[in-house]
Amino acid sequence: MEIRRAINADYIKIVRAIQNKGIKYITPAHVKEDISLGRQFVMMDNNKVIAILSLVYDAEHGYFAMKRLCVTNRKNNGKGYAQMMLKVVSGQANGKVGCTPWIDNGAMCHTLEKLGFSLEYIFSEKWCFYSKNP
């Protein structure tokens, strides 16, 4: 199992994995742009996509945003893959890192807190902003 930056050769595998799971919030255009800009990370095992996560610098707010986390197969839920992705990818940032889960996503909020992220505020009634400094 490895976590690394995605490359162009990963594009089709990633898109198929998110389409097979029925994910609508991550589009092929997101994947293509994130790969081309070096901000798409992928967890692979035996040439299969296990999880993806993007690390995008937000110049307006001055932090690295972790976006579009997806464990691509439901059978892999609860195995710690999301936590591994968050830990490895947040370590790639050279500054403040942020993540914005929904307030009712208790598993994600708990995982972020375990990794040392702090809840800074809640916005638009349902979004939490968690951050961590290097």
Identify the meaning behind each predicted range.
Residues 103-122:
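Conserved active-site alpha-helix within GNAT-family acetyltransferase domains
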Residues 16-29:
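Helix-loop element at the rim of GNAT/NAT acetyltransferase active sites that forms part
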Residues 42, 48-57, 63-70:
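Conserved beta-strand in the GNAT
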Residues 67-77, 101-102:
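A short, internal acetyl-CoA/4′-phosphopantetheine-binding micro-motif in the GNAT/acyltransferase core
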Residues 92-103:
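Conserved GNAT acetyl-CoA-binding A-motif
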Residues 1-14:
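A short beta-loop-alpha structural element at the N-terminal edge
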Residues 100, 118-132:
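Conserved catalytic-core motifs of GNAT/GCN5-like acyltransferases
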Residues 77-91, 110, 114:
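Conserved acetyl-CoA-binding loop-helix of GNAT-fold acetyltransferases
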